[in-house]
Amino acid sequence: LFRFCEDLLLAQEQGGVLGEIDITKALENHSLVIVPCLNPDGVQIALGKDQPPPKSAPGSPWQANGNGVDLNHNFDAGWELLHKMEEQEGYIGPGPTRYGGKRPHSEPETRAIAGFCLACDFRRVYAFHSQGEEIYYEYGADTPNRSRLMAEVLAASCGYKVCRPEKIASHGGFKDWFIHTMHRPGFTIEIGRGKN
């Protein structure tokens, strides 16, 4: 992602192209907004530079924020259904992953990015997560018609698979909220190999 940003800025500065796209012309009427990290506290914990919250359950590698809430389970898109699934799987309080909080948008990071999207009225979003080489594009009946084609074009450009999120990963995420709320295309791109 950082390499892409560097290439994009260099192409714009030099009046060049990137992937056969004239960047200067493309950015005349379009904007590209990049939020490099929505969860800096969680990253610090995952890297061992900070301690997890005192009452958090031990276990999986750390994916949650500093409060032990998994931000990709905290958005108001099927949150109640997701919360029941979390409880059935034993995620009942703060921990390293899959606990969506006491209510949707309970976390400052969730509220910040949702408010930012509403204020800026984005046409689409791309959320980059780590591991899986997969692209998710749908959220039930709210999925815009052109989303599948857009996901297939993305997949063809990078060799990833277009997939459907399952079970506990099928609600409460940023992409889900954006599609549900804005009625526009949203994508989660699982970059890199491996599993969470």
Positions of the model-derived regions?
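Catalytic cores of processing enzymes, dominated by hydrolases/peptidases
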Residues: K102-R103, E134-N196
